[in-house]
């Protein structure tokens, strides 16, 4: 830590650590992210999220009922001014196994992306390909990324608004070739908790704008929208995330997710609705279309006393 914390800050940090540890443990359990004997490759960017992820996983490793390895990996993409000494120095203090990789993806990105355009998408794809390959090389069974709950929700809205897809970041993902399993242990954790925890812990943060790329304006707009919602309607973000875990394909419009074409009614089904009328009190209403008086009675269910049939 860069400076001495007050007793109140120490207490707050312990509370945040417990919360994050609980959330990460629950996410790991819910999605079976880490199993006995796993070698987990924690990808570090030098940002608050990946630092917090490594910190919490190391903490859980000491408490978990199963045994698993943790290997920290950072990819130096040769961005101008990247401080090469910060991560090794920090990781040395932890005593965790680590690898620092070097690959000049920066030059590739600058060559392919016009000046002034955001480079984040291509940069991340090149980084992912390098990390996937290295994970296989060292025998890593899981690749842990530092995306949190807010990232997942933002991605869903980005895809809805700009790509016409209901798609987010899954907490657990098998790569297209089936060779790598990606996990996101912070899937249940809020960004503001992670940011506060990182500040109290004094992680040596490396800025992500060394490449000079403009911020992804679409993601920034979605993030601001969610921040405003959280401010104006407390609990809305939690409700959105809960909704993402409770989808009902049969109640949607995606024909790939539900077979609407094969739906058929059962002509032998009993004459009843979703609610058993026998459990409802008798009541009357007027059939506006036919001007007929319909009485719903517990004994006879439906008694039509007047019906009009056109010639």
UniProtKB/Swiss-Prot annotation:
GO cellular component, one term: cytoplasm
Locations listed in the record: Cytoplasm
Chief location bin: cytoplasm
GO BP: tRNA thio-modification
Record carries keyword Zinc: no
First-tier enzyme category under EC: transferase
Enzyme Commission code: 2.8.1.-
UniProt cofactor(s): Mg(2+); [4Fe-4S] cluster
Cross-referenced Gene3D superfamilies: HUPs (3.40.50.620)
GO function term, MF aspect, one: ATP binding
Cofactor note: Binds 1 [4Fe-4S] cluster per subunit. The cluster is chelated by three Cys residues, the fourth Fe has a free coordination site that may bind a sulfur atom transferred from the persulfide of IscS.
Keyword GTP-binding: no
Function: Catalyzes the ATP-dependent 2-thiolation of cytidine in position 32 of tRNA, to form 2-thiocytidine (s(2)C32). The sulfur atoms are provided by the cysteine/cysteine desulfurase (IscS) system.
Protein family (similarity comment): Belongs to the TtcA family.
More info: The thiolation reaction likely consists of two steps: a first activation step by ATP to form an adenylated intermediate of the target base of tRNA, and a second nucleophilic substitution step of the sulfur (S) atom supplied by the hydrosulfide attached to the Fe-S cluster.
Protein name: tRNA-cytidine(32) 2-sulfurtransferase
Organism for this UniProt entry: Shewanella halifaxensis (strain HAW-EB4)
């Amino acid at each position: 830590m860069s400076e001495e914390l007050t007793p109140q800050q120490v207490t707050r940090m312990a509370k945040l650590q417990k919360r994050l540890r609980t959330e990460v443990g629950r996410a790991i359990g819910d999605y079976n992210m880490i199993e006995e004997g796993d070698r987990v490759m924690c990808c570090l960017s030098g940002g608050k999220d990946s630092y917090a992820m490594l910190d919490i996983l190391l903490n859980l490793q000491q408490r978990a009922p199963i045994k698993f390895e943790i290997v920290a990996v950072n990819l130096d993409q040769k961005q101008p001014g990247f401080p090469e000494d910060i991560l090794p120095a920090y990781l040395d203090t932890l005593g965790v196994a680590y690898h620092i990789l070097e690959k000049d993806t920066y030059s590739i990105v600058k060559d392919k992306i016009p000046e002034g355009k955001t480079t984040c998408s291509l940069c991340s794809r090149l980084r992912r390909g390098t990390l996937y390959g290295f994970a296989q090389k060292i025998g890593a069974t899981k690749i842990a990324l530092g995306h949190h709950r807010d990232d997942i929700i933002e991605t869903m809205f980005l895809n809805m608004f700009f790509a016409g897809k209901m798609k987010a970041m899954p907490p657990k993902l098998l790569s297209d070739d089936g060779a790598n399993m990606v996990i996101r242990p912070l899937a249940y954790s809020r960004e503001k908790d992670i940011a506060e925890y990182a500040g109290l812990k004094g992680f040596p943060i490396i800025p992500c704008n060394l490449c000079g790329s403009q911020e992804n304006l679409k993601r920034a707009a979605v993030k601001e929208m969610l921040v405003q919602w959280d401010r104006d309607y407390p609990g809305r973000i939690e409700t959105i995330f809960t909704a993402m875990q409770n989808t009902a394909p049969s109640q949607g419009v995606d024909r790939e997710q539900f077979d609407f074409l094969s739906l058929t009614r059962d002509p032998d089904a009993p004459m009843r609705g979703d609610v058993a009328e026998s459990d409802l009190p008798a009541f009357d209403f007027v059939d506006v279309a036919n001007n007929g008086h319909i009485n719903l009675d517990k004994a006879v269910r439906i008694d039509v006393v007047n019906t009009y049939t056109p010639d």
